[in-house]
Regions:
Chain B
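Alpha-helical multi-pass transmembrane bundles of energy-transducing inner-membrane proteins
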Residues: 29-31, 119-122, 126-210, 302-373
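Short helix-boundary/re-entrant hairpin motifs in multi-pass inner-membrane proteins
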Residues: 220-286
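Short aromatic-rich membrane-water interface segments that cap or initiate transmembrane helices
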Residues: 2-3, 70-89, 202-217, 282, ...
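Interfacial segments of multi-pass membrane proteins
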Residues: 153, 242, 321-333, 406, ...
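Cytoplasmic/organellar membrane-interface segments at the starts of transmembrane helices
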Residues: 368-400, 448, 452-531
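Structural signature of hydrophobic alpha-helical transmembrane segments
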Residues: 4-15, 83-94, 136-149, 213-227, ...
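Transmembrane helix-loop-helix hairpins at membrane boundaries of multipass inner-membrane proteins
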Residues: 1-10, 21-118
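C-terminal ends of transmembrane helices
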Residues: 20-31, 98-110, 151-161, 165, ...
Length: 116, 531
């Protein structure tokens, strides 16, 4: 389990970093999305990898170590997903605007051969 | 402290939130009404900030904090909002700049696109929230609120330059957010808490292994804040962004870099202050040298700048570099000098950003500039820029304001920039000799010199050349904010002592994080009687 999670986070990070260094804005946004998936997973496993454990007790029982999963990372990751989603959507709008105004999807807003 | 009083600290967040929401409902056609509501709310925010600074400053040192437990949960479990002297001082500076920028935007810039006023209020909400929060994740949320609003404002008056700059600005900040979250995750897994006070309380007794994890987390977080405060080499976005943004927005962006410095200041002295065990002074050297590099980069950039907006941008970079260097020196005696410089340089750079737009009208007929930025948006409103009263002797006003800005930013006597710089040098020379101090001394002088050269060159070119210049029509509401900011800077020079005393008290607060920790953690949830 640890190995799978660690590898997948690593692969997501690596692909994300590769993509955001590319010159097309579409590649950049895919890279940003991959990075945010990676970081969300990373945030999620800070609560330790636990399977089949509730995040909170439904009634007042005394706290027993190991019976419950850590609820905080789950709450954090939910918020992070929502915020990441919203800001990526915002970037997408700017990307489309840039595509429409400049006629190219290069991140600099112009193709290399048009360099002054 | 009575219960009702502490709850005032929520208002600087709620007021912009509700105003922004209200403004969303009003149609763009009612421009004056929207402006009026926005301005009223921003003015209220200013008075609120004065009041809050008064409250936090007048209380004795052991109980000056305004702590509000949101949802009535005790401190490490719920999210707390904390107002202390440092936060309320920044609140005040931010509200001042917001008022100046908003008044300036009235006659032209606010009408360039839709939802300027709403975004402006949401930006203020994000700034105030980030200043007042006492929780790392909540800080992230407010940062994102602020950044989302700033994306919108940067793109306000949509043209190709702004889109291009906006894309870079957004990508850089989204990446910074990734680092921010990574940092939060690492800090949480090291300590099991995200509350500032609780983190600080756990620092001295942390075991070795989690401590290393925490250091990694803190470094990740620092990447996010240092990107915001434009440290070299993370600050390349700044000049492009600032010169693309419309002047009132650029004025607010100047304050955002200072917000990065504020967070660093707060977290550094809470987590890595003198009594944080093995972590005391963590990475101070890094901050010092990176700050020096930023200073050098800013000075070189300033020398190479031709356009006024670039001069303003690199002045902001220099100011960030100096502040980061002083933070990295980790000398408590420098703190009040640093804060004084921060206030003075923020006001001066903002005034200059607003002023440059007025100066540029000298040689280009105002309408053509306007038409250029109006290319893609609402061309039918082009003719309506007649609001406000024109002031006489425009050239004399522009010239004098320009000289004042130049003097303050370059740090020449007799204005506040000189006092700030003198203060820094005075403290620097009292420290024992070391290479980095001398480097700082030399770079500080060089930065001043390049600032003088850049400003003189620009001034000579704009005011003294024989090209066909027109005396521009200045509106009172455009000249007013510039004048206001400059008068404030000048009065900083005259009333340096009361301000200095306040800054000394802030310094004392920062050096004794114990007060902060105890007050936050000892605040109890209120028990509400059943009705």
């Amino acid at each position: 389990m640890e190995l799978i999670l660690a590898t997948s986070i690593g692969i997501l990070f690596a692909s994300g970093i590769w993509l955001i260094l590319r010159p097309r804005s579409f590649q950049v946004i895919i890279g940003l999305l991959l990075l945010s998936y990676a970081v969300n997973l990373f945030l999620f496993i800070t609560g330790k990898i636990q399977v089949n454990r509730p995040a909170f007790a439904s009634e007042a029982v005394s706290f027993i170590e190991g019976l419950y999963a850590d609820p905080l990372p789950q709450a954090l990751v939910l918020t992070a997903i929502v915020i990441g989603f919203a800001t990526s959507a915002l970037y997408l709008v700017v990307l489309l605007g840039s595509r429409g105004l400049t006629g190219t999807d290069h991140v600099d807003g112009k193709e290399l051969e048009h360099d002054e | 402290m009575s219960l009702l009083l502490a709850e005032i600290i929520v208002l600087p967040i709620l007021l912009p939130l509700f105003t922004g929401a209200l403004l969303l409902l009003i149609n763009e056609r009612h421009h004056k009404l929207k402006f009026f509501i926005n301005q009223t709310s921003t003015l209220l925010l200013f008075f609120l900030a004065v009041l809050l600074l008064g409250i936090t400053d007048s209380a004795p040192a052991e109980q000056g904090l305004l702590v509000v437990l949101s949802a009535n949960w005790a401190a490490p479990f719920g999210i707390v909002l904390v107002g202390d002297r440092l936060a309320t001082l920044f609140l005040l500076v931010g509200a001042l700049l917001a008022n100046a920028a908003l008044i300036f935007s009235y006659s032209r810039w606010a009408r360039l696109g839709v939802h300027f006023h709403t975004l402006f209020q949401f930006l203020l909400m994000g700034i105030n929230g980030a200043l007042l929060t006492g929780d790392l994740f909540n800080l992230f949320v407010f940062f994102e609120v602020m950044l989302a609003a700033s994306y919108g404002l940067l793109l306000h008056g949509y043209n190709i330059t702004r889109i291009r700059a906006g894309m870079q600005y957004i990508v850089v900040n989204l990446l910074a957010a990734v680092f921010f979250l990574l940092g939060i995750a690492l800090v949480y897994s090291a300590t099991g808490t995200l509350n500032f006070a609780d983190l600080a309380a756990k620092m001295p007794t942390l075991a070795d292994e989690p401590r290393q994890l925490l250091h990694a987390g803190a470094a990740m977080l620092a990447v996010a804040f240092l990107t915001k405060s434009a440290i070299w080499p993370l600050g390349f976005w700044l000049p492009t962004t600032y010169s693309a943004a419309s002047p009132p927005v650029a004025a607010m962006l100047v304050f955002l870099t200072k917000l990065g410095i504020y967070i660093l200041l707060r977290l550094y002295y809470l987590l890595f202050g003198a009594n944080s065990g093995a972590s005391a002074g963590f990475a101070a050297d890094f901050l010092l040298y990176a700050g020096l590099m930023t200073l050098a980069f800013g000075a070189l950039g300033l020398l190479a700048s031709q356009e006024s907006s670039r001069i303003a941008s690199y002045s902001a970079v220099i100011s960030s570099g100096l502040l980061l260097t002083l933070l990295g020196l980790a000398e408590p005696s420098m703190l009040s000098a640093m804060l004084f410089y921060l206030i003075s340089s923020t006001l001066a750079v903002t005034a200059f950003v607003l002023l440059t737009e007025l100066i540029e009208r000298i040689y280009t007929p105002a309408d053509s500039v306007f038409a250029l930025s109006m290319e893609f948006f609402a061309p039918e409103e082009e003719k309506q820029e007649s609001a406000g009263v024109a002031i006489p002797a425009a050239m004399a006003f522009l010239g004098m304001s320009f000289v004042a800005c130049a003097l303050i930013i370059a740090g020449l006597p007799p204005l506040s920039g000189f006092i700030a710089k003198f203060n820094i040098l005075h403290h620097l020379l009292q420290l024992p000799f070391s290479l980095s101090h001398w480097l700082l001394l030399i770079l500080l002088m060089l930065a001043g010199l390049t600032a003088i050269i850049a400003f003189m060159r620009f001034g000579v070119r704009s005011f003294w050349t024989a090209q066909a210049t027109t005396s521009p029509r200045l509106k009172l509401n455009e000249a007013g904010p510039v004048l206001l900011l400059l008068v404030l800077c000048i009065s900083l020079a005259f009333f340096a002592e009361p301000l200095h005393n306040l800054l000394e008290r802030i310094t004392a607060d920062l050096q004794h994080p114990q007060r902060y920790i105890e007050q936050v953690l000892s605040t109890l949830p209120t028990r509400k009687e059943a009705p």
